[in-house]
Amino acid sequence: MAKTLSKPASGALAPWLGISLIVILFDQLSKIAILKTFVYGAQHELTSFFNLVLVYNRGAAFGFLSTAGGWQRWAFTALGIAATLVICFLLKRHGQQRLFSLSLAMILGGALGNVIDRLVYGHVIDFLDFHLGAWHFPAFNLADSAITVGAVLLIYDELRRVRGSR
């Protein structure tokens, strides 16, 4: 069977790493734009439910461990690097499984986008702020979005696989 761009050969890492690189690029460019446009804590209302803000997250998702004293920067950086190694192994091994690999590529790009922030700035830059009245969902960024979409696709792929085996 001829190899095509639509279906990478088993073990073909390049297409999936390319997707991860695109995620990283969009994530980092968006953060640079926010850093050049906003001062810390600034907020710009775009709609009745969405603002652009500039906040720093020294913790994990939803600010978990953000006040832990500094060790979490290196712990989450190490976790991101470990996840990178595991994901690259899985992509190498299962590169022919398109949805599975796409989900991992998105998670990888998002994880590395946030690792770059931790290494360069000492914290993750968040700027997307959705709210309903006075209640605000924790601010997040494009890397977080890619991780979330990747995780949802991963769950969907697994459910599809389980249903297909019945």
Curated annotation (Swiss-Prot):
Which pathway is it part of? Answer: Protein modification; lipoprotein biosynthesis (signal peptide cleavage)
Q: Which GO terms describe its cellular component?
A: plasma membrane
The protein's annotated catalytic reaction(s) are: Release of signal peptides from bacterial membrane prolipoproteins. Hydrolyzes -Xaa-Yaa-Zaa-|-(S,diacylglyceryl)Cys-, in which Xaa is hydrophobic (preferably Leu), and Yaa (Ala or Ser) and Zaa (Gly or Ala) have small, neutral side chains
- What keywords were assigned to this record? Aspartyl protease, Cell inner membrane, Cell membrane, Hydrolase, Membrane, Protease, Transmembrane, Transmembrane helix
Residues forming the catalytic site: D126, D144
* Segments traversing the membrane: 9-29, 49-69, 71-91, 100-120, 135-155
| Gene Ontology biological process terms, A to Z | proteolysis
Q: What is its EC number?
A: 3.4.23.36
Record carries keyword Membrane? yes
The molecular function GO annotations come to: aspartic-type endopeptidase activity
Identify the PROSITE patterns for this entry.
Answer: SPASE_II
Write out the annotated subcellular location. Answer: Cell inner membrane
Q: Which EC class is the enzyme in?
A: hydrolase
Main localization category:
membrane
Provide the membrane topology annotation: Multi-pass membrane protein
Query: Record's family?
Result: Belongs to the peptidase A8 family.
Q: What does this protein do?
A: This protein specifically catalyzes the removal of signal peptides from prolipoproteins.
For this entry, the protein name equals: Lipoprotein signal peptidase
Give the organism's phylogenetic lineage.
Bacteria, Pseudomonadati, Pseudomonadota, Betaproteobacteria, Burkholderiales
Gene, per the UniProt record: lspA
